[in-house]
């Protein structure tokens, strides 16, 4: 029996990842893990809990907020920066080869390492997470790249005594392709939340809102978030 721990932010990518894990391994073998890190959009944790409840799987939560106390990343509550209201392509053009301002320092590395500890304790041999090609493009989020995934997988596999490895099933896929798969799997997108501003109604202007809208449009699908549906209840 293979048990899987899925990093779940309550957004499109991680919810599709969760749907894929459940399809492949069965919901009785899947645990969802969500992490608080001081994000402005902590509404996403409610979304992740609702998605887990929808699938009737165990949902764990972990608070790593203190680690980022001194970070001025625009995604965090303590930041003096505003979240950019423009596409990632526009942000990258201004970044001069550096990650975008919403890049949280080594966030995925920290999340995966923490998940590895919990996975060993819970008897999970695989950690799933929803990094995809678009997030890694231009090094907007370097901890979403295939090279990073391979390096972290090797470190976790060896560091866990070969008990745990990680899989990023979408690392070679675009957001459009992720949404296509999610629609095929009937992922509960009506329960998801993505906006970096953290308001009840998505702003439609931040990088992740723009990217999400483009992915649904490319699939000729209407985003439930734009139909007035919310993630407040299952």
Where do the model's predicted regions map?
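ATP-dependent adenylation/nucleotidyltransferase module used to activate substrates
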Residues: 1-186
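Glycine-rich nucleotide phosphate-binding loop and flanking beta-alpha elements
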Residues: 135, 216-217
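Short functional micro-motifs and their immediate structural scaffolds
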Residues: 26, 188, 211-214
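Local cysteine-cluster metal-coordination motifs and their immediate loop/turn environment
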Residues: 109, 113, 193-214
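Short cysteine/histidine-rich metal-coordination sites, predominantly Zn2+-binding motifs
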Residues: 198-199, 220-231
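Short, intrinsically disordered, charge-biased short linear motifs at domain edges
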Residues: 182-184, 189-198
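Iron-sulfur (Fe-S) cluster-binding modules
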Residues: 35, 233-234
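Short amphipathic alpha-helical interaction/hinge segments
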Residues: 160, 217-220
